[in-house]
Amino acid sequence: EGLLYQASGLHPDGEMLVVSGQTVTCEEYLRWVDYACQYISSRIPDVDWNEQVSEDGMTYGEYVKVEAVETVKQYAVIRAWAQQENVTLSDTDKAQLAAQRQQYVDYYGSEEAYLQQLALVGISDEGNNATLEVQYLYRDLYQSFCTPGSSLYPDDKTLSDYADQQGYVSLYVLKLNGENAETMAADILERWQAAEDKEAEYALLCDELQLTADGIVTLASAEGDALSDAMTALEVGEMASVIDPYGEGSCFVMLRTDTDLAAVAETYFDTLFEQKLEAASVVTNSKLYDSLDVGAFFEKLTQLRTEMMEAMQSTDTPTGTADDTADDAAGTTETPPAE
């Protein structure tokens, strides 16, 4: 049943958690327990998993278990969100997943060799594919949510209200440096104010000053920041110069525009994801969860992995370190960008 099962005694298909209605199997959970153990042990050689690491008495082993819960919670919440919004893998997604898998098969030389690498990680081909699929679902949710005109794109009122709550402003900004920055700022402000086509004048000024034309930038206000205070004080269509707000010699010339709601949608998506994570219901199979001794599990897993690698090397099967295998054969060890 695989190395994770042999090291833990927990069947891969066992239900370790239910997060927002999504089942998290022992295989999925133990994968991230292993990952957290590898991370900590790489930085703290000979770590004592029973050593306390916090004032409330949490040990390294308990910390690993909690971190693994937080990781699988992210994946489960994405699955639940996608299901709620009827977001499924597109044909393009499936083709990309298949191509990604084939790259690893080609790298290791055969289907059999690739599956051996997954076995070294301790996960099944199906389990690995399921993890990768969630990352595509996250991307699809994000793109649909943040693309104007798409089915999940929020209405303007929702985004406007959110922008107001967070203090978002959108502006064209020119940053000037050098000894003559203050004089230049005054001249540019006067010229820009006189121009009929403000956007075209911005592009022309960027070209003349050899500045990157970033276009409209959307920023959240920062209380007590001199430049931010000046930005938020502007009305839409109003312009101003800000002289050396940070005492470093830089000056800014700004034109406030209507808030770029598409830019706001991106941060609103992140906020919603965080809210869903915080609100997620987590039901733990206490019998399975409490039975896991992280120190014993990782020690046994390391031993089994070493033995398997030695056997694979004796038959000339390409191998790397356990960490290399987790990163390469399994496609990724990255979690969705939730934090």
Where do the protein language model's features map onto the residues?
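Short, low-structural-confidence N-terminal segments
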Residues: 1-62, 66, 229, 233, ...
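Extracytoplasmic
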Residues: 11-19, 167-173, 247-248
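Soluble non-cytosolic domains of exported or imported proteins
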Residues: 27, 59-76, 88-95, 127-136, ...
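Acidic helix-start/capping segments at beta-turn-to-alpha-helix junctions
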Residues: 50-59, 79, 89-110, 210
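Acidic/polar surface patches and capping/hinge elements
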Residues: 129, 136-172, 179
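Peptidyl-prolyl cis-trans isomerase
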Residues: 187-227
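C-terminal soluble interaction/assembly domains
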Residues: 242-271, 275
